[in-house]
């Protein structure tokens, strides 16, 4: 949070009383290493360095000392945030949490269906306290438009989320729900394509999937989408971290993001592209969900095992509930809890 404030250097000096240095953001590499070395040479008493829009570097003669220094500095920052943050970091709440299960099921199916036209995707839903505080706030759209907090997150979450109308508004227009969602997705897709065209240079990797990863809905929560469940969940966790950073920065000062150009340079960095190319190909049923009846029996169990081994998420059912629970635990141990329900 301190690293993303518009007066971050000033706040760092105030919190650490000269014991922590500051460097403006730049991509990791040899030049950044030289700047850090130069800063340490000129300030031999500092315990760490904050890199703007990124985070904290600490060191020590031993790994234990380095860890201890890191914990000490983080606790000092947390104490400052806790004592200084205002009540409504994102502005006063203008929405309240709302629940309407039948419509929510339709909404989830509609959004996932529209996002899966070209490539099947899996949804992760988050209704945590920080998510509801953010999506129900007065300044949701303004803060969301600044972009996510940490450059490391861009590949997971994209720079910007998509913000939909409130759940009440969507319910009121239930008969036009497909049109509303499709229009918002098209708007996001076109804006992302323009962002790519504005910032690409010779040798830039090709345009990636232009659709949103993170979708925010006032009164409801956050949806994240990816080609598999674990990636969707991690993307959600990353954006929860981003919202906490935004809350800290907005609650004391003003949250700032990287420039659009620099954000693009990170998102489409050759090193990041190399990471993507090294990832194993998706399995045949990645992005799919299967409902399996009689899953505790021989045929159902074998079917579930085959689907899971091909990357599918499965929902297991059986009239023998005790046998079903045992089989479910067996599959969770083998394939992970993200894909077994």
Protein language model regions, located:
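Glycine-rich flexible loops
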Residues: 1-290, 302
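Conserved glycine-rich Rossmann-like NAD(P)H-binding loop of the short-chain dehydrogenase/reductase
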Residues: 310-327
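Rossmann-fold cofactor-recognition segment
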Residues: 331-341
């Amino acid at each position: 949070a301190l690293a993303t404030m518009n007066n971050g250097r000033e706040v760092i000096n105030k919190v650490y009383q000269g014991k922590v240095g500051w460097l403006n953001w730049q991509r990791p590499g040899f030049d950044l290493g030289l700047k850090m070395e130069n800063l340490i040479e000129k300030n031999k008493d500092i315990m760490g360095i904050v890199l703007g829009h990124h985070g904290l570097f600490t060191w020590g003669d031993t790994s234990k000392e380095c860890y201890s220094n890191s914990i000490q500095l983080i606790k000092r920052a947390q104490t400052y945030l806790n004592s200084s943050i205002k009540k409504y970091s994102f502005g006063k709440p203008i929405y309240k949490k709302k629940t309407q299960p039948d419509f929510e099921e339709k909404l989830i199916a509609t959004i996932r269906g529209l996002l899966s036209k070209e490539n099947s995707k899996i949804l992760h839903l988050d209704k945590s306290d920080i998510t509801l505080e953010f999506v129900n706030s007065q300044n949701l759209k303004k803060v969301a438009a600044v972009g996510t907090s940490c450059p490391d997150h861009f590949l997971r979450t994209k720079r910007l989320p998509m913000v939909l109308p409130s759940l009440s508004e969507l319910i009121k227009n239930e008969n036009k729900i497909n049109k509303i969602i499709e229009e918002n997705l098209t708007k996001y897709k076109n804006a992302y394509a323009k962002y790519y065209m504005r910032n690409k240079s010779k040798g830039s990797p090709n345009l990636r999937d232009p659709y949103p990863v993170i979708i925010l809905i006032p009164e409801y929560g956050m949806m994240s989408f990816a080609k598999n469940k674990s990636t969707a969940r991690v993307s959600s966790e990353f954006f929860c971290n981003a919202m906490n950073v935004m809350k800290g920065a907005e609650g004391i000062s003003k949250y700032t993001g990287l420039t659009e150009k620099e954000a693009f340079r990170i998102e489409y960095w050759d090193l990041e592209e190399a990471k993507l190319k090294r990832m194993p190909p998706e399995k045949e049923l990645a992005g799919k969900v299967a409902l399996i009846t009689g899953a505790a029996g021989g045929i159902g169990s074998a079917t579930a095992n085959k689907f899971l081994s091909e990357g599918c998420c499965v929902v297991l059912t059986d009239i023998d509930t005790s046998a079903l629970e045992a089989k479910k635990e067996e599959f969770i141990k083998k394939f992970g809890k993200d894909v077994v329900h």
